[in-house]
Amino acid sequence: MNNGILHQNYNSKKFDIIKISLASPEVIRSWSHGEVKKPETINYRTFKPERDGLFCAKIFGPIKDYECLCGKYKRLKHRGVVCERCGVEVEQAKVRRERMGHIDLVCPVVHIWYLKSLPSRIGLFLDMPLKNVEKVLYFESYIVTDPGMTPLEKKQLLTDDEYAEALENYGYEFEASMGAEAIRDLLADTDLETEIESLQAEYEESKSTAKKEKAIKRLRLLETFQASGNKPEWMVMTVLPVLPPDLRPLVPIEGGRFATSDLNDLYRRVINRNNRLKKLLDLNAPDIIVRNEKRMLQEAVDALLDNGRRGRAVTGSNKRPLKSLADMIKGKQGRFRQNLLGKRVDYSGRSVITVGPSLRLHECGLPKKMALELFKPFVYSKLRLGGYATTIKQAKRMVELEEAVVWDILEVVINEHPVLLNRAPTLHRLGIQAFEPKLIEGKAIQLHPLVCAAFNADFDGDQMAVHVPLTVESQLEARVLMMSTNNILSPASGQPIITPTQDIVLGLYYITREKEGARGEGKLFSNYDDVSRAYNSGTIDIHAKIKLRIDRQVFDTKGNTYNEKGVVNTTVGRALLLNILPEGLSFSLLNKVLVKKEISKIINQAFRVLGGKATVVLADKLMYAGFKYSTLSGVSVGVDDMTIPENKEAKVEEAEKEIKHITEQYQSSLITENERYNNIINIWSKTSDEVGASMMDAISKDTVMVNGENKEIESFNSVYMMAKSGARGSYNQMRQLAGMRGLMAKPDGTMIETAITANFREGLSVLQYFTSTHGARKGLADTALKTANAGYLTRRLVDVAQDLVVIEEDCGTDDGLMFSAIVEDGEVKVPLVERALGRTLAADVVTEKGVVLLEAGTLLDENLVEILDDNGIDMIKVRSPITCKTRRGLCAKCYGRDLARERKVNVGESVGVIAAQSIGEPGTQLTMRTFHTGGAASLGITVSDIKVKTAGKIKFKNIRTVTNKDGQNIVISRAGEIIVSDTMGRVREQHKIPMGAVVPLASGKGVEIGDVIATWDPHAQPLITDVAGKVVLEDVIDGITSKHTYDDLTGQQTIEITSISQRTTSKNLKPVVKVVDEKGNEIKSISLAVGAVLNVTDDSVLEVGDVVAKIPLEGSKNKDITGGLPRVAELFEARRPKDAAILSPCDGMVRLGNRDTKEKQRIEILDKSGHIAEEILLPKSRHLVVFDGEQVSKGDVLADGPTDPHDLLKYKGLEAFADYILIEAQSVYRMQGVVINDKHIETIVRQMLRKATILDEGDSKFVKDESIELVRILEENDRLAKEGKRLVEYELTLMGITRSSLSTESFLSAASFQETTRVLTEASIHSQVDQLRGLKENVLIGRLIPTGTGLAVRKESNKIEKMREELGVEDNMIFTEASSFNTEDTLFENQIEKEDKDINDDIEESLRNALESLDF
């Protein structure tokens, strides 16, 4: 008996896949334990369930354990007996959570999901519009199901009158009916095979794309039904399953009333209507009444399944829509997200956090009361083992009375038992870390100050939760993987996240500053102890400059050791810190003024050279010192610390005078409104900066007497020190405190032109205060929106990347991405060394002389990237997650180094989730606004030349030049760049050169710092001719396509091309400048864009390099740039921008002006033989950047606009696309000063490229133009290659993260993300199988996730499975009695034991490796 139970429970957990499909009536009946016939629930007097009702004990099982309803059979001994009086089986009461019932519907009912979830599956299957299907279903029209010999058509709709007429004319030769029966008959009658064949023929023959698309959609649906084993008529239900009663409870509340689940109401409506319909049919009621009742039954079932999907939602007594079955599973409060993906856990507590400055990094302070509650079971068992209590009850009593011995035992229990601390919101994995608890009095949890940055915690009332890992394994994982001391580096950037902030920084800054003429200056000390004694006795000042003899051992990153010896100039404070500095680090790290950045460097260096353990100790010591000396320094802020500059009033008056002058100019109509506004904003910006500068001058210098003369030294002003050290505050805030507040922004981002001239020390007037509130309120509103948006972005990212895990060491590819330094505005923002660190080389690194420096497959560490730098390598090929060939995962080599652990990434690391967290976590720091360029935001001066900042050589890239009559070299190419390399050949600068720029030097020439390498007109883009000849103007007609103006002063005529939208007639005219030779043959034609101002007239003579026309740049620059969070979301969602740039689909020559239509212009691209290879239609308002007859390559820009990532991938290839996303996303984060490693963005990009489009199906089952998972195509190609058949050809398709998440192979993961109804409908028709590969699916069904230690466990269990199969052992043999084992089983048991030992050894080994790498 017992084994049966075990077996039953064991099996319920053991499955490999989950399949979802349509349920047939037979299947529904097989689930059921009886039919629910009555709408009654329970008897309100006896509280017993009614028989055959919704809570019937006979159908669903007993209410009390092992007790039938009437009480005849009680106790376990009667288990399994069915009571003959009440018909209830004697069982556990929990079967009421599992047993289902059913309702036999009198007439069929359509399942609303397959009707209304778009696209309507029933409509598509029957090839009928949804409206028509609804008319039939809700009894408005008849539908012909069998036309017989009549001229009626199958599926033709008939109104009542038409039906009556047809009956009169044809009698009963045809069949027509209405309601779900009709639909069911039509579905059942469809012959799938013949229908599929006719559709395939239609698809082949059809010429129109719309028809083809419709045919292919229908074809796919029919093929799905054919393949999945689902019958189409199952979309119409004849039997309705009833949920087990304990999942829709009815609970008595005081006052004799009941609280009930909405589902019971919905079921009661269905049963009532079903029973009424049965009665009406028995009575042979009139057709119209029956019809109405059938319609109501359909509506009742609709409401039960998905309330509100059709028509108005059914409401309860309180006017609230009832919660249907569909509502139970979808949304944040649904089953998936509320109960399966996020559960509440036992053994946890929460409390306010407070600062624990005396803790060590791996400790936290846990209030005694809390600890006792959390560790109760451990305390109970220790009390029994120690002999203090004989029973658990006694132990419990002792704990409740809080006897003295309990506290002693609690100390023992919590010793070295780590607890997890978590602060919500947990934006990245460092939001949960493990600490060793220390018992403290009070009720607040004490947190170590250095981990605040990781938790983003402060002590203004934040709360944190504590969780206790119970099992030994979980304690081990907490200690090895989650301990705060093992999480020194941030997984997002690889930089230390444990760096001192605020008070600590201030203290260290204060004691490392020097003061002229301080007490004890110039003394020489022989060691640290002498300095310490002298300082403690008060003979020397902490800021005094002294000399100190040192003798230390120093290690470098390459592992070499050298001695640091001799006398150094230092200060007393720095000498005192020498005691903290561990052996191996140079004193020069400390021997300077320690601002925040420098302290970070020390910790970084310590980690690189000495490893984790020493770094943790150093960080703690730095913290103690920082706190100690910031206390001793007595730094505080007073009103007098804010020094207002003396020249402030004069500056403000001067600005007001200038503004008055500008206003007068505006009133005399000499300048425009826009110029007036911009000038005023400029003046106030400048004034504000000048006042700020004078304030900084005043506040940053002090005058002291040294040897009787005045000397200027750096100030010890408190506010200045706080800002300078990086502890708190910034220059901007100081300016507002003591300078002037300056310009304020309106909520839309534009500046208010009346600046605030007061500062906070003087105080603001009412008007100025009001002006300030504008921006401040916007800030608060923004923050609230931003948090939600950033959270949603993180959720989408996690969802798309959750199943990406490192599953093998090496995929063996030699593909990769080309990496070079990132250059913005000509400056190197991110050097190659930083980008290459921690990546694997995909190709050998070779010098110009052909020497192989580093071989492919090398993992670049700090020492190896220096080799790149030393040899002036400016481009390398590295392996990338995007190009990794591993299927359903990644390989360790393509991913490279694990940023948080500084070694190669482990197999089993869930890199997808880490990537998503790294990108999403800083989301709240990004701005929400779009930047308005033009106006106040772009106060930068317009750039019109390029001066080099590095001495070296210049090199042209994609630059074509012509020499004009003045001997100048004019650039005539569009996307040209000049690269500046230093003397070593390393790329130091990279500048984009606009068309029309003059370049004085040739490629390959040497340059010095400050040399000008290009100049151009910043206000206009010139159109330049590269041929000489005579001008013929075509379609340049005054008043129609152009505007001719004469300047009376100079007598010159200007011709400006007007916009098409301003023309009333002649919309097909295209203004062109043609250059002809002496015989009048055309050599070149230059099309003129809107706004172009001509420099030539008819019959002008042109030389090579002359300017034909200029396009003013004002109009094109004043666009909004989407910045911050919306930009990142836009990139990852792969949205197509409005008016995107048009790229050339192939190589060839451009031909314009041929067969243009009224509204559109046509670009034709001719191949080498002169045939049209591709043609593109564009609105005439779009500005083309190519000329007639120009040669273009695939992917060249034809019409400018923002980049469309889809086109970039299609025409320029994977690498160009990857580059674009990386650079764009990184520039947003860089603006906010956030460092994220490239590989995280690449990891997400990989997930956006999971699908591919079939170009040629080969010998596969796929259909051309179908979009399919890349993995499936590759697997199919492997199969075809084995059989020697034609392979599938495909191209990668780009999908945004939301679409990518919804189209994953796992329907569980997709359904728990968004659009649950749609996903489940789709999956059930396909009879989809979920292989449970990802993390989310396994969390949903409550298993270990297949990553980290879970992956090891899964691999081992798969091994055991395999052995089971080989030995032919069934599962239940494990549960048979030992005596009945045969030899084979015993052999198997031994094998299992050995395997178990192996598993333990494996896990032990992986943990040992982890421990070793962590330096314990």
Curated annotation (Swiss-Prot):
It comes from the Bacteria. Zn(2+) 1 binds at C68, C70, C83, C86. GO terms for cellular component: DNA-directed RNA polymerase complex. Mg(2+) binds at D458, D460, D462. InterPro entries: DNA-dir_RpoC_beta_prime (IPR045867), DNA-dir_RpoC_beta_prime_bact (IPR012754), RNA_pol_asu (IPR000722), RNA_pol_N (IPR006592), RNA_pol_Rpb1_1 (IPR007080), RNA_pol_Rpb1_3 (IPR007066), RNA_pol_Rpb1_3_sf (IPR042102), RNA_pol_Rpb1_4 (IPR007083). NCBIfam families: rpoC_TIGR. The RNAP catalytic core consists of 2 alpha, 1 beta, 1 beta' and 1 omega subunit. When a sigma factor is associated with the core the holoenzyme is formed, which can initiate transcription. This is DNA-directed RNA polymerase subunit beta'. It comes from Francisella philomiragia subsp. philomiragia (strain ATCC 25017 / CCUG 19701 / FSC 153 / O#319-036).
